[in-house]
Curated annotation (Swiss-Prot):
<dbReference type="InterPro" id="IPR006145">
    <property type="entry name" value="PsdUridine_synth_RsuA/RluA"/>
</dbReference>
<dbReference type="GO" id="GO:0160136">
    <property type="term" value="F:16S rRNA pseudouridine(516) synthase activity"/>
</dbReference>
<dbReference type="InterPro" id="IPR000748">
    <property type="entry name" value="PsdUridine_synth_RsuA/RluB/E/F"/>
</dbReference>
<protein>
    <recommendedName>
        <fullName>Ribosomal small subunit pseudouridine synthase A</fullName>
        <ecNumber>5.4.99.19</ecNumber>
    </recommendedName>
</protein>
<dbReference type="InterPro" id="IPR042092">
    <property type="entry name" value="PsdUridine_s_RsuA/RluB/E/F_cat"/>
</dbReference>
<comment type="similarity">
    <text>Belongs to the pseudouridine synthase RsuA family.</text>
</comment>
<dbReference type="InterPro" id="IPR036986">
    <property type="entry name" value="S4_RNA-bd_sf"/>
</dbReference>
<dbReference type="GO" id="GO:0003723">
    <property type="term" value="F:RNA binding"/>
</dbReference>
<dbReference type="GO" id="GO:0009982">
    <property type="term" value="F:pseudouridine synthase activity"/>
</dbReference>
<dbReference type="InterPro" id="IPR050343">
    <property type="entry name" value="RsuA_PseudoU_synthase"/>
</dbReference>
<dbReference type="InterPro" id="IPR002942">
    <property type="entry name" value="S4_RNA-bd"/>
</dbReference>
<keyword id="KW-0413">Isomerase</keyword>
<feature type="domain" description="S4 RNA-binding">
    <location>
        <begin position="1"/>
        <end position="68"/>
    </location>
</feature>
<dbReference type="InterPro" id="IPR020103">
    <property type="entry name" value="PsdUridine_synth_cat_dom_sf"/>
</dbReference>
<dbReference type="GO" id="GO:0000455">
    <property type="term" value="P:enzyme-directed rRNA pseudouridine synthesis"/>
</dbReference>
<dbReference type="InterPro" id="IPR020094">
    <property type="entry name" value="TruA/RsuA/RluB/E/F_N"/>
</dbReference>
<feature type="active site" description="Nucleophile">
    <location>
        <position position="102"/>
    </location>
</feature>
Length: 231
């Protein structure tokens, strides 16, 4: 990779600005100042900007994050903090959420810079299952599981929801597995049967389950098995 392209990616600036910084003697390779923007970087090179090391990125990246409340899954929001706050990774701004959560919803968020991989999670034709732990305002009705298994009519929607699986844990806490990703779907499904979601926590996406060792705001790389489970 050319040095100016690498610096542009790392700093989030244009190639022209990156070239200016290089010519300004602010970039070193293996401890030596390099002023040639076209310098060919090799994987073993150590690059620094103003003395701060810059890590070269090799291949796509995949992480799971335990999202706390109060953060949005977009990578740039003028009004709210984003989940990128938690990711201490080079050029973290290149990562995106493979399946977003609302600002008040907690739990599993998958972050990647592999667009094809995330498409297999978010595309409706792949029917990727997601499991949520749901806390309800009122005790769940006896026939809710049956209604969800058949599909319910959401407000302002033409088609019924696809069959969903409801597991009752306590009268006001349930586990719901769905295979589509309509707008605010879980909250709207319970509204359709006369209940209200108080808390919502995503536990699973496809074959990837939130690591119980991750506290809110913590993240880790996905394992090879977890990455390969998204097909």
């Amino acid at each position: 990779m050319r040095l100016d392209k690498f610096i542009a990616q790392q700093l989030g600036v244009s190639r022209a600005i990156a070239g200016r910084e290089i010519r300004g003697n602010r970039v070193t390779v293996d401890g030596e100042i390099v002023r040639n923007a076209a310098f060919k970087l090799l994987p073993e090179h150590d690059v620094a900007y103003d003395g701060n090391p810059l890590a070269q990125q090799h291949g796509p990246r995949y992480f799971m994050l335990n999202k706390p409340q109060g953060y949005v899954c977009s990578t740039d929001d003028p009004d709210h903090p984003t989940v990128l706050y938690f990711l201490d990774e080079p050029v973290a701004w290149k990562l995106h959420a493979a399946g977003r959560l609302d600002i008040d919803t907690t739990g599993l968020v998958l972050m990647t810079d592999d667009g094809q991989w995330s498409h297999r999670i978010t595309s409706p034709r792949h029917h990727c299952e997601k499991t949520y732990l749901v806390t309800l305002e009122s005790p769940v009705a006896d026939d809710t599981a049956e209604q969800f298994a058949k599909g319910v009519q959401l407000h302002n929607e033409k088609d019924l929801t696809k069959p969903a699986v409801l597991e009752v844990i306590t009268p006001t806490q349930v586990r719901l597995t769905i295979s589509e990703g309509r707008y605010h779907q879980v909250k709207r499904m319970f509204a359709a049967v006369g209940n209200h979601v108080v808390e919502l926590h995503r536990e699973r996406i496809g074959g990837i389950t939130l690591d119980a060792d991750l506290a809110p705001g913590e993240y880790r790389p996905l394992t090879e098995e977890e990455i390969a489970s998204v097909v």
